[in-house]
Amino acid sequence: MTGERVHRTSHSTEVDAPAGIVYGLIADAVRWPLFFPPNVHVEKLETDGTNERLRMWATANGQVRSWISRRVQDPATRRVEFRQSHPQAPVETMHGTWAVEELPGGTTLLTLLHDFTVHGDRPQDVDWVQRAVDTNSRAELAGLRQLAERWRHFDELVLSFEDSVRVGVDAPAELVYDFLYRAGDWPRLIPHVSRLELTEDAPGVQVMAMDTLTADGAAHTTESVRICFPHAGRIVYKQTATPALMEAHTGEWSVVSDGSGTTAVSQHSVVLREDAVERVLGPGADLAQARRYVREALGRNSTATLELAREHAESAVRSG
């Protein structure tokens, strides 16, 4: 058992939404990267409907951190208990609770509690963890509150879709993945990418800033964190700085082989920024138009990238 001092924090917010809606967003951890600004990606490793084990990636004080978390959901009391089973230093232990309480008048009190210890309990390390917990907790509560309070038209704000390209049977799937992985080369390979800066301080964790061109020639700057799984042929990402029309944007590149060839797939999930619709698309524009615009713009660029990945793999076979 740890001998370090236990540090405790509590953050709460009142949400103008039913308690069931708020609890549902907390319970759906796999979609947290779409709901919570700090969260990059969540992999569900195992679950029985109540107990679950999750691998999580999130930003903390400007760094990308990863850990495994065990959670116990209790829909009856609207509480979710969590414990990091493999915390990343300087964290030694991390436990906590999400508590959802129905208030008179139909609003909800959402409380997030953390108990943690720090290796060696050095003041600078304790300060680092406290700042990360405080910053992320505030961002998570604010993001959830903002989304939950628009629950009546949640389905209009959120959209998910995918595009795919079939690759020839003789083209190695590894070359398709290689093209998608080597994003630092994209400015000289992909016409709609005019600038891309990429760092990979930890293997498979890429941080990048990119300028892309739209069909009308306008440039958009985005920043992203990408988590790469080469053995599974997957690259997942979260945009940490999005275009004006998008509140949040997550996605995945995947390369899947079968007996007759390879399919390269691009998946997107987006939360629209409702108050930017008319500013971006013009007076009178609505969410339906915004959905079409985002679907077309993201789909066009993704498909172009997939086609170039296909050509990269197939041309290597021809030239070989």
Question: Language-model segments: which ranges?
Answer:
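Hydrophobic ligand-binding cavity/cleft-lining segments
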Residues: M1-T50, Q130, R138-A202
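Glycine-rich portal/gate segments that line the openings of hydrophobic small-molecule binding cavities
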Residues: T2, V30-L34, H41-H95, G184-R188, ...
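Beta-strand/loop substructures that line and gate deep hydrophobic ligand-binding cavities in soluble
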Residues: V6-R8, M56-N61, S66-I68, R83-R138, ...
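Generic structural detector for well-ordered beta-strands
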Residues: S12-E14, V72, A99, R166-G168, ...
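Short, tandemly repeated low-complexity microdomains enriched for cysteine and small residues
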Residues: F35, E43-T47, L112-L113, D121-D127, ...
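A broad, low-specificity signal marking well-ordered, structured residues that form hydrophobic/aromatic
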Residues: V80, W98, D163, V167, ...
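N-terminal membrane-insertion helices
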Residues: V133-L141, R145, L298-S302, L306
